[in-house]
Amino acid sequence: MAENQSKLKRLAELLRKNPNDSFAKFALALELIKADESKKARVLFESVLEQDPEYLGVYYHLGKLYERTDRVEDARSMYTRGIELAEKKNEERTKHELEEALETINLDNDDNDTL
């Protein structure tokens, strides 16, 4: 717990010094998720996406965050947009991870539709 708080403080300070640093926002958002601060993490991920739509890693993590908060359509949109960007950038591994996430969310919600 203390280690996570220390990371949070260091990353927050880095972001204060460089408020437009997409990596700092992304890294801080990941640590905020670990600290159960999903709303703050979502705001940072969305800021990265708005400022730097080519930042490929944000699509998977923001999609997962949307899933956890029952924003299924937003999650689908993130995964789909991420897949398109990964194709454009020839990032096969990331594309595959996003496709798996999209397939899982579609299967989970198809199961819910039949209940």
Protein language model regions, located:
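Alpha-helical linker/edge segments of TPR/alpha-solenoid repeat scaffolds
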Residues: E73-S77, A101-L115
